[in-house]
Regions:
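Class I SAM-dependent transferase core
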Residues: 1-84, 92-96, 100, 113-115, ...
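Conserved nucleotide-cofactor-binding alpha/beta core module
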Residues: 76-196
Length: 218
């Protein structure tokens, strides 16, 4: 069966993403334009636009399209802004961020995922303003600051270092808490003081090294 990906992309936006209160025109245009199927394993390509998390291996998964849409809308990356992505994954959200912002630095701890994402970005021509680094975000050291920080996997609690990478006025998206009910939040480095906005409930795999400590029952 031949899949009409253009139609599938339109259906994803109109039937999944927009009804979940994603109304930002730039975000909707990005999701309606970028080929999500090019970032999905061949075995899952028929499900590229389904309302599902898709496995990436290494205990990670690709966010549902609705979560990607809400993430991008909350962060509002602008054309003159720089983005730090923590967890490259498939490279699809990386491409979306790159389409909306000036530059994306994306950190991926798994070398296989980093290499595959780089290849997909190059093959689609969507990676010209993207740099992928095969590093652990929990130990990565940089003096650079970013307008947007996007954490694509969950954390039990938000590492202080992630917040330190924000410029004044910067925004950080992260999913925090304990499975199965986690909270997506937006940290804003406001000039009047940092603030946190609660966005929605979801459930994501944990960032490597950021899961809760095991609970021992005696």
């Amino acid at each position: 069966m031949t899949i009409n990906y253009t139609q599938a992309r339109e259906n994803m936006v109109e039937q999944q993403v927009r009804p979940w209160d994603v109304l930002d025109a730039r975000v909707l245009e990005t999701l309606a334009t970028l080929p999500r199927e090019a970032f999905v394993a061949e075995s899952h390509r028929a499900l590229a636009y389904a309302d599902l998390e898709l496995p990436l291996g290494h205990g990670q998964s690709m966010m549902k399209p609705v979560v990607e849409g809400r993430t991008l809308q909350a962060l509002k990356p602008q054309a003159a802004e720089d983005v730090l992505e923590i967890g490259t994954g498939s490279g699809y959200l990386t491409a979306c961020l790159g389409n909306l912002a000036r530059e994306v630095v994306s950190l991926e701890i798994q070398p296989e995922l980093a290499a595959a994402a780089r290849a997909r970005l190059d093959a689609t021509g969507l990676g010209t303003n993207v740099r992928i680094e095969n590093v652990d975000a929990l130990t990565w050291d940089t003096d650079r600051r970013f307008d947007v920080v996007c954490v694509t996997a969950a954390v039990a609690s938000v590492p202080a270092r992630f917040l330190q990478w924000l410029r004044p006025g910067g925004r950080l998206f992260v999913v925090r808490g304990a499975s199965p009910v986690m909270e997506a939040v937006l940290h804003v480095n406001d000039v009047n003081g940092p603030r946190i906005e609660s966005l929605f409930e979801t459930d994501l795999p944990y960032l490597v090294g950021a899961a809760p400590a095991p609970q021992f029952v005696f």
